[in-house]
């Protein structure tokens, strides 16, 4: 496997090796083919790229900083840890990088209505935000379980003018919300644009979302070059569907000196049935229009994912991650709920930054690795979102711990 083979994908059929593709209903096939054509044309259009750059700068607030986490570094006593500060974006997470790109594409295609799925609510908020900015009606599908644990984001979406449809099917989480959004799309193909929030779904979504998120890695390369005069030694990011990770990783896939680590949600532990680690605990199968690693039982039924973090609570993973796992370019590990919570508290106390519980999984892995590494090792952690949305979850967890004590 030569280095140049890590970054070419996907092929014309949307495949990364044997992963990805377009497994969709016949009614949707013309739509995804049309979307792929439109996206290729937009990518080659200087006017589209200029408009995208304008919104990235003046609306999202990019570039965001690459911040040296000095006290966390001292605390760990090893590698020099940097945070890529995606939580400082408008709307508080990396999700908006992708939403602004897709809404510009929807506008270019003459679509009049946006739909999206959301888990933690951050993609829903980002979609509702861009819908408001461009004056488009917007329907967000959200699992009833997630609505319960993400009240603040639900209210934000409503304030921004979005309609929220609670999904009670299945476990009432992200997978079920995505199923409902796909059903809506099939019924409203003419005027509706489905704004998928992660590097999953049928081609061209995994590649398109990755491309809109790849600004994370491009900025990181330039910023670290300026600060340290060289490439990072390692990159760490959390992986649910995997868009913040793909955004950071893609720029460095062909740099053999850069070690890349994706962190899955280990829940109560990958040895239990309460986790969301598709690569460490799943097998290949087809879900939501693409072939990838999935959590499923012996009959091929999708099993429930569990994570303390709503944004990682998905039983699959983006197909490009599945490919990078198989060719061993990226190392995928898992972090438990408890380890993520410890890292969450440490980052609050040491750096004065309240990270999202999703990002806390990446921070936990960084805290684990850093002490074993030399002091000149440069480690970049993607701080994918801020933790405001997780206050209730953390409060509940702390209250439960106090009761046990």
Swiss-Prot record:
Keywords: Amino-acid biosynthesis, Aromatic amino acid biosynthesis, Lyase, Pyridoxal phosphate, Tryptophan biosynthesis
Signal peptide positions (record): none
Cofactor(s) named in the record: pyridoxal 5'-phosphate
Domain of life the protein comes from: Bacteria
Pathway: Amino-acid biosynthesis; L-tryptophan biosynthesis; L-tryptophan from chorismate: step 5/5
Enzyme Commission number: 4.2.1.20
Major enzyme class: lyase
Record GO terms (molecular function): tryptophan synthase activity
Residues modified to N6-(pyridoxal phosphate)lysine: 95
InterPro entries, per database record: Trp_synth_b_CS, Trp_synth_beta, Trp_synth_beta/beta-like, TrpB-like_PALP, TrpB-like_PALP_sf
UniProt keyword Lyase present: yes
Catalyzed chemical reaction(s): (1S,2R)-1-C-(indol-3-yl)glycerol 3-phosphate + L-serine = D-glyceraldehyde 3-phosphate + L-tryptophan + H2O
Cellular component, GO annotation: cytoplasm
Name of one Pfam family that matches: PALP
Family membership noted in the UniProt record: Belongs to the TrpB family.
PANTHER family for the chain: TRYPTOPHAN SYNTHASE, TRYPTOPHAN SYNTHASE-RELATED
Assembly, per entry: Tetramer of two alpha and two beta chains.
Function: The beta subunit is responsible for the synthesis of L-tryptophan from indole and L-serine.
Protein name from the UniProt record: Tryptophan synthase beta chain
Organism: Pseudomonas putida (strain ATCC 47054 / DSM 6125 / CFBP 8728 / NCIMB 11950 / KT2440)
């Amino acid at each position: 496997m030569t280095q140049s083979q890590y970054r070419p994908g996907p092929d014309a059929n949307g495949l990364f090796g044997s992963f990805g593709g377009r497994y969709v209903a016949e009614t949707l096939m013309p739509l995804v083919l049309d979307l792929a054509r439109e996206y290729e044309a937009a990518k080659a259009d200087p006017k589209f790229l200029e408009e995208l750059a304008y919104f990235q700068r003046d609306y999202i607030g990019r570039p965001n900083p690459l911040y040296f986490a000095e006290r966390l570094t001292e605390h760990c006593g090893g590698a020099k840890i940097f945070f890529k500060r995606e939580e400082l974006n408008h709307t508080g997470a990396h999700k908006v990088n992708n939403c602004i790109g897709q809404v510009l594409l929807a506008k270019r295609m003459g679509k009049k209505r946006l739909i999206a799925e959301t888990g933690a609510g951050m993609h829903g908020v980002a979609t509702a935000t861009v819908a408001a900015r461009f004056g488009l009606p917007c329907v967000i599908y959200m699992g009833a379980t997630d609505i319960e644990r993400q009240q603040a984001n639900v209210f934000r979406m409503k304030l921004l003018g979005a309609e929220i449809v609670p999904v009670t099917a299945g476990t009432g989480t992200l997978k079920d919300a995505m199923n409902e959004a796909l059903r809506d799309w099939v019924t409203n193909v003419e005027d509706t644009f489905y704004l998928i929030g992660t590097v999953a779904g049928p081609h061209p979504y995994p590649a398109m979302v990755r491309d809109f998120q790849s600004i994370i890695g491009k900025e990181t390369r330039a910023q670290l070059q300026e600060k340290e005069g060289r490439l990072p030694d390692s990159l760490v990011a959390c992986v649910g569907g995997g868009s913040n990770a793909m955004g950071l990783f893609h720029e460095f896939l062909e740099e053999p000196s850069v070690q890349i680590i994706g962190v899955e949600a280990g829940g109560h532990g990958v040895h239990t049935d309460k986790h969301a680690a598709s690569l460490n605990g799943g097998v290949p199968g087809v879900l939501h229009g693409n072939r990838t690693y999935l959590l499923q039982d012996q009959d091929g039924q999708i099993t429930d994912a569990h994570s303390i973090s709503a944004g990682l609570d998905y039983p699959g993973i983006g197909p490009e991650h599945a490919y990078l796992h198989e060719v061993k370019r990226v190392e995928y590990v898992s972090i438990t709920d408890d380890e993520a919570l410890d890292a969450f508290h440490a980052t609050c106390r040491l750096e004065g930054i309240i990270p999202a519980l999703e990002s806390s999984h990446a921070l936990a892995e960084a805290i684990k690795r850093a002490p074993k590494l030399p002091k000149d090792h440069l480690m970049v952690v993607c701080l994918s979102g801020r933790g405001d949305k997780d206050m209730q979850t953390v409060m509940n967890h702390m209250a439960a711990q106090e009761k046990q004590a």
